[in-house]
C-alpha cells in the first residue's frame, strides 16, 4: 500500500501520466481507470476550442465589411446653382469634373476678372485659396490651382484654330484627382500631371457658369467622400465573431474542469461577508454620489461628448476635432457604450453614472481583495483602511468624474491584479485566463491601459511555473489554447466593424499629424502637471504629490 509521501513523489516524477498524477497504481484501482478517457476528451476539447477561438479572433480583422458609399454629383435638376457640401474628412476620396470648352470660353468673354469655372470652397473665403481646388480662365488661358499651388495652364485661344482635332462643341476640359495624383486635360491635350496627393478641401461646388448664358451641356462634377471607415460587419464576420466568443467560453469552462488536477479547490468567487457594508464603504460611496452632482467636469468631457454624439451619424466613433475624424480604433471601445448611454440623456449627472459605478466597484476590489493581501496588520488596521479610502478619493474625484477612460483602466487593472494573485494562490489557470481577458480589454480601451499588464510581468516566474505544472498533466495545447483565446478575444471588439487596413490607415494618419509622444517623453506629463494651465490645478497635483 502506497503512503501519501510516495504518492507525492510519484506525482512529481511522472506528472504527465493520468494514473500517476492521482497517486494510484494501475492494477489496484482499475475501477477508476474509466475516468481517463473523459479527461483525455476534456484535454482535447479544451485545446480544440481554444485553438478555434484563437484562429477566429485572428481572422476577424481580415474578414470583409460592408462599406457605406455615397457620391455627390453636380449639377442637380433645376437651375444651375452652387451647392454647399462640407466633408467631415475635408478631402474627398476622389474628384472628377467635366466642363465644356465652349462654356469656359463664354464665361471668359463676359468676365472682366478671372472667371472661376470650378471651385471647392466659396468665392471670397479668407482661407479658401490655400486649401481649395480652383479651375479658372482669364484671357483665354486655363489655370488649375490646388491647395495654393498652380498645377498647370493651357491656352484656349488655339481651340478654334484647329490645334485640337475635335470641334469646339465636343471639346471637354476634364479633371481627375485622388490620393495617387491629379491630372487635367483640354480635349486630347493633358496639361496637368501630378504624381502626388494634392486633393483639395471640399466645402461645396461653386462656379460662375450660368446655364442661361453659357453652353453647359456636358457639365458634370462628381465627388466621392472618404467613407472607408463607415462600414458594418459582413454576415461572415458576424458569424466568425459569434463563433469565436462561443469557442473561447467553452474552452474556459473546460479549463476550469482541468484545473482540478493541479490546483487547489476553487474558492468562492465572492466569499461570505464580501458584500457586508462598512462605514468606510458608506463614506466612499456617499462622497462619490455627491460628486456626481456637484463635481467639476473633466477637461475632455465636452470633447468626448461631441465624439460619441456624432458616432450615430458616422457609424463609428472618430475624433471629430482632429485627425480628419479617423476611428479611435484600436483603442476606445468603451466610447461605443458611452454613445448608447448618451442617447438617453446628455445631462452631466447622467453621463457621470458609469464612472460612479466603476468607482464603487474599484473601491470594493481595493478594500476586499487588495488591502487584505498586504498582511494581517493592514487587514486589521482601521487606520490603514481609512487612509486607503482617502487616497482613493483624492485620486478619483479630480481625474475620473467624467467620460475619460481612466475609470476603465482602473477597474481593468484591479481585475487583472486580483486575477493574477488568485491564480498564483490557488494554482488554477482559469483566474489567469480571466485576468488576461480583463487586461486585454483594458489595453484596448486607451494606451494608458498597458498598466494592466504589470501584474503579469511582476508575477512572471510563478506564472511560468504554474503553466509548466499544468502542462505536465494536461499537455501544452490544453493549457495554452484557452489562455491565448481569452487574451485575443478582444480582437473581435476592436475589429467588429473595421478592417485591418482601415486601422493601419487611421494609425498612420494620427502618427503623421501628431502630437505623438514617445515613451521617453513621459516627463512631459509632469511638466504639464506643474504648469499654470488647467492640467496643473491643485486638485490634480495634490494626489500625485501625496
Annotate each PLM feature.
Residues 3-11, 18-65, 227-291:
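Start-transfer (signal-anchor) and selected internal transmembrane alpha helices
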Residues 45-121, 125-133, 137-140, 273-301, ...:
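Transmembrane signal-anchor helices characteristic of membrane glycosylation enzymes that use polyprenol
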Residues 79, 83-95, 100-231:
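Extended repeat-based interaction scaffolds and adjacent low-complexity, acidic/S/T/P-biased segments
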Residues 218-230, 332-345, 508-539:
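Juxtamembrane membrane-water interface segments that cap and precede transmembrane helices
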Residues 287-380, 394-403, 410, 532:
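Active-site lumenal/periplasmic loops and adjacent helix-entry segments of GT-C-fold
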Residues 364-365, 379-461:
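Membrane-embedded helix bundles of polyisoprenyl
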Residues 476-524:
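Membrane-lumen/periplasm interface segments of specific transmembrane helices
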